[in-house]
Amino acid sequence: MKMEDLFSLLPWLRDVPVQNQFSLDDKMYSDALKLFTESKSILSNNVSPIGSTTPEELERYMFAFILYASKRLGAKTTGDASEGSNQSGITLCQKLKAVKLNLVDFFKELPQFVVKIGPILSDMYGADWEKRLEAKELQANFVHLSLLSKYYKRAYQEFFKTNEVDKEVADPGTSSSDSISDYYRFGWLLFLALRVHAFSRFKDLVTCTNGIVSVLAILIIHIPARLRKFSALDLPLFEKKIDRGVNLVASLCQKYDTSEDEVKHMMEKANELILEILKKNPCSASLCKTENLENIDPDDLTYFEDLLEDSSLPNCISMLEKDYDAAIWNKGDIDERVFVNVDDSLLGSGSLSGGAINISGLREIRCNGLFNETIASPLSPCRSPALHVNGARGGVNIRMISTPVSTAMTTAKWLRTYISPLPSKPSPQLEKYLMSCDRNISSEVVRRAHIIMEAIFPNSALGERCIAGSLPNSNLTDNIWAQQRRLEALKLYYRVLETMCTAEAQLLHANNLTSLLTNERFHRCMLACSAELVLATHKTVTMLFPAVLEKTGITAFDLSKVIESFIRHEDSLPRELRRHLNSLEERLLESMAWEKGSSMDNSLIIARPALSAGINRFGLLAEPMPFLNAMAAHIEVSTGGLPPLPSSCKHEFAAGQNGDIRSPKRACTEYRSVLVERNSFTSPVKDRLINNLKQKLTPPALQSAFASPTRLSPGGGGETCAETGINIFFSKIVKLAAVRINGMIERLEKLEKQSQTQQLREQLRENVYCRFHIILNQRTSLFFNRHIDQIILCAFYGVAKISQYELTFKEIILNYRKQPQCKPQVFRSVFVDWSFSRRNRQGQDHVDIITFYNEVFIPSVKPLLGELGPQGACVKTDLIPESNNDKDGQCPGSPKLSTFPSLPDMSPKKVAKNVYVSPLRSSKMDALISNSSKSYYACVGESTHAFQSPSKDLTAINDRLNSTSKVRGALNFDTDAGLVSDSLVANSLYLQNGNCATTSSVGPLKTEQPDS
């Protein structure tokens, strides 16, 4: 294929400096031309009146995506980097620069093209094209590198000067802060070498952060001392000291919440790379006499002569550049060196993932999420109160902005501190529950857990080829990583399973939990939830959700059955992991439960038989869970030491507990958690009253959740478990919709005209909510394969037209863009099946929100919207001018609906005598509460114990408030009272200067570790 073929399609491409024809061979060019030609009609339909993108801009985005897809999907899957080494590669960054795009904008549009061109890619490259394309992994990798580069920059600037480090003088118009230090660039290149060679498969955020800290340690002992901003005697920076000097690695790990063992391991890998790539000879630091090692303990440190001297630094950088070029030359991935370049215009600005991840590096908290009430509280601080042996607080007591990297490291510290020390087998108490079933199921539980964890965290195959350029033992490193993650997830699974069993046993007043503990789906959900939390802690790029669902054979709807119970039965679970589970449940409610293959549909055909035809027509039913033995046969699982599967268990796995495996139509349904009705914060007395009441009225939560959907609900009323579960599930969706509708109304208020009254705004909110509620119950099929926000947006416009509210669809979309959950594909790509529409079209497609509104939404819900107007007189005005439709039949009677649900406000809430809950963030609470009265408050995210809910302190607070003893008594100078030491006085003075300290003779102060 010639370039003229592309020039004829894209005239603007003639002005693009084409380097080696974008590194595509003839077949790739042919595929690219075919892909672009077949996608051109889709491209023309993509120009929507609600967007501002010009046709040429869309062509540039599509051309960049097609280049990336053709290169990624058309590349050979065999061979190594030596094949075709005579060709010149081109990175994704170079392609985007050629077509005048940046990375952030490219990744924002990437999901749109994946959906639009997906069917064409499937025909050209096979059904597994999306897995091979690795678009989600590439985007997550970009976000992680953006965060890591800023993390590295902050750390470097804290230790080293950023000016007067290069021989060349910067241009007069360039500030010193804009110049890039050669030492700074060397550190980033060494980190990239670690990423390429040492941990090539699992590039998770925690492992990468450990790598950055190891590189920082190498820089500290090699960068000339004249460029330091610190002294080795500085207490805030280097807290770990011994007689021979500062323990460098331990001090850095203390400061950055990293694992000392992992950082030492990374330093060994980095030293190997310096030896192999830079050809520098290592020597023991204890044998070297250099200014850089003064006051630093040299034990276990390696020093390289002339590594970062002025004479050798340029050559070292050049060699690292060549090594990186060789590693990425033909992959078409991101050139990760762009993150430390002076000109970062290629990076772009803004946020990805609907605002959940911000490229600026600062965490954005979605304050208007659904589950602010249903979760008892954020149970752990972002930073745990690590203390010295003598009680002195480590570091400077300054509340710093939490970043995604520092938060991930704090969460990883929770795994090391609370989960890793646990046994990797059932505890004696859990064994008691397993043995108390109708038969002893201990061996079955252990074997299942082993197989599932091996499926989620597999070892590298023995014959698996190492990635080109990797160190010889990189597969061994990957296997060690997988083994560590398996153990963490396994220990967490056993821990939470025990607490759940204890709660169920107390509720039933019996230890026989056969119905629950013999349910295969329940255990897989628990294992998947544990593994997902471990993956979320490490921010693993190659195992993004819903990977754990695919590995375990369950669906997102199944996982939702244990999310609430999992959170409530693990008190030490950090705040970020609770938010992660809540976000997963929100994703389930808004879209994943409505996708093809969701087990919710298996319950819907029982709870709502009228929907069975539509569910079968769209092929939505979930596939059966794979057999456990079949999963074991497809993974390399070592069963040494594990008992064989009993015959009774084999029969159960074949038949499936409650028909789970054999018949997908009898899938388990949603459940009502024992504690779901609890307030966000309650007093211990109220807790006991609620628990006593629910023990009498509420059936066992988990057992009923995983019961057969055709079984009558234990709650009575003649409902089946499927009906009860669907009703509860729909109520959660309605609540989520109410939160989002309210957010839209609040943002619309800023744009309204003065003539429109508050009453009209309230009426709009009420009507949109009521219409959504009715549509969910009477037009449920509109939600299949769609996002609930698409229905909300259409309901907004339809109600606005009926109510003669001056609001255009463009204004609705512009305000929706400001919502924290906004994703462009929600209003750009809406699923439609033309086979069942009135138009003479066939097949399935994705259209913009306006086309969906006119062609599908209005014909279905027009009678429901007409109820708002006088005798349905406004039916003709509810269409966008692009099309008109005939009237439907009369609308069936709608049930009387409750008013718009009350949402949490920002006023302090009294939850018990003398106890109020304030919504203020802890940073504002600190400014309002004096030090002397802090012990009377439980602040959100803080507690007297690390990773514990503040609600656990309410008993102590009540006792303190209701105590008759005087709080302030006379000073006791008795001999057994203990004297105030000089160190306490010194530490108290140190506290006044912005630091905090405690002593063993006084109760520890509530402190918070500073972020990095």
Curated annotation (Swiss-Prot):
Record-linked InterPro entries: Cyclin-like_sf (IPR036915), RB_A (IPR002720), RB_B (IPR002719), RB_fam (IPR028309), RB_N (IPR024599)
Protein name per its UniProtKB record: Retinoblastoma-related protein
Family: Belongs to the retinoblastoma protein (RB) family.
Region of interest (Disordered), residue spans: 884-905
Localization per record: Nucleus
Keyword terms: Cell cycle, Nucleus, Repressor, Transcription, Transcription regulation
SMART domains per the UniProt record, alphabetical: DUF3452 (SM01367), RB_A (SM01368)
Organism (species): Oxybasis rubra
Domain of life (superkingdom): Eukaryota
